[in-house]
Amino acid sequence: GFGRGQVKPEGSGVAFDSAQETFTARYTHETIALGFAITEEAIEDNLYDRLASRYTKALARSMAQTKQVKAAAPLNNGLPGLTFKSGDGVTLFNASHPTVAGTFSNTLSTAADLNETSLEQAMIDIAAFTDERGLKIAASAQRMIVPSALQFTAERLMKSQNRTGTADNDINALRNMGMVPGGYSINNFFTDPDAFFLITDVPNGMKHLERAPLTTKMEGDFDTGNVRYKARERYVFGVSDPRGIFASPGA
């Protein structure tokens, strides 16, 4: 992008700015596959139908579970100090994402558990997001994602009419102002029981790209007489713009 517009004195030329490429987010598709075999003897003993039905359901469940784990991996491994990095070379959730104009943060400056104070601070921090040239983009949170351990905390924070955890007769500002219009969802594949995440309205954030959809194949093996089944798909989960998501790893 460009910096702020410049005042043009009367009779002077227009100031020109230069657009710059920042970083490249790379996505490497993974091939996910799994198979099983039913022996020729099992087929002869009339076990084929029963085993095939049970095993194919188990195969589908395994493939679905793998996709869920892969989908959660950027969030699980992108917390401060872990291994998943965005295209700018730092962890997905970082206080110092580099930009042309300086840095920006998509995590709390002081890690905190999910409560009214930390969630309100997250709203303030998201609203302060800037683009590559330091211009404010007026970002806002759209949906919160929590591990199952935080589902009850999230329910109270999002839906109580009054403030939670206090005897003060104050309204629940987060609820009344509609700060998280999409509510919250639970992800059972998060590995940190006290981390919470906020999807923002910044486009090109978290992405799922599919190179080849799930397919299944079956064939007989001449040598053993076994019947073999396999399932296969290719996809990748990643992030293009870290501003698309905000997180706190918990205290």
Predicted regions and their residues:
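Alpha-helical scaffold segments that mediate packing/assembly in large oligomeric complexes
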Residues: 49-54, 61-125
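Polar low-complexity intrinsically disordered regions enriched in Ser/Thr and small residues
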Residues: 4-8, 14-16, 84, 90-92, ...
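Long, contiguous amphipathic alpha-helices that act as assembly "spine/axial" helices in icosahedral shell
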Residues: 24-82, 144, 229-231
